[in-house]
Amino acid sequence: RFYYSRLEHSVGTALIVWNFTHDKKQTLAGLFHDVSTPAFSHVIDFRNGDTLTQESTELNNQKMINEDLELSELLFSHGIYKYEIDDYHRYPIADNNIPGLSADRLEYMFPSGCSLDAVWNMDEIERLYSQVAVLENADGLPELGFLDQQAAFDYMRKFIEVSMILQHNEDKVSMQLLADIVSRALECKLIAEEQLFTISEKALVEKFDALAKDNVDESFTRLYHTFRNMKVVQHTQEPLPDSYCVSVSVKKRYVNPLVKLGNGTSSSPAKAVRLSELNKEADSCIKEFLSFADTQFGCVPWC
């Protein structure tokens, strides 16, 4: 286990973009892509009802960047305008649509895999990263991909292995329950919305502990005690009595990376195709993941 913050993710994303582009604007777009992310990160997407795309917390990104005068002056001194770095979606190396591989996706899955299920070690990460290169996809756009089919397969398989954790009701219950705790705290004015951007998650949890101990609001206390004390999530087709139950579909995070074919020449660049077109096992693995569905409900007894 190790500490992994949104800042570290953003710096890592920027470093990957720089490694493959040496472009300041793309790199800064990667660095600032999550500045509007509040405490508890994607939990707030659940609170906003955005479980399928989990992008609602990005909505204020451009606004926050464009309102920062100090940042504007610093960028201008380097000949860069804020509009050139306020949306990393315009740079396909930084971000692209699933199932493509981007710096953002490449970065978050390595530490996530290390912490959630220990699927990577540093030697594996170094081996796989050394096989990543900028390739051209079917739309003629640059995209991160692999020089070696085996490396692409190993990365895809472990990516899906980690992503499967997020498809289970255990994760859905945890995310939605914490989202409801935050919502109740805001409804009761136990915290203010701006504190999600000014107070650390550790400090907020300590505040929640104290609020629950003092039982300042019965509904908040019940939600929080359940979150703190739940042991086993029941997988059911119907909601259970005397239980907190969740039924929600969530974003399916996976990659079907490009693989370079041959070496190419100056007049005829090497082509790249999706891994699933080259490897039947990869195709089956992806299809199995996409077809997976947990039971309709995940439930935990109220505490």
Language-model segments: what does each one mean?
Residues 1-25, 39, 43-303:
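Histidine-centered, transition-metal-coordinating active-site segments
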Residues 26-34:
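Short alpha-helical catalytic segment bearing the HExxH-like zincin motif
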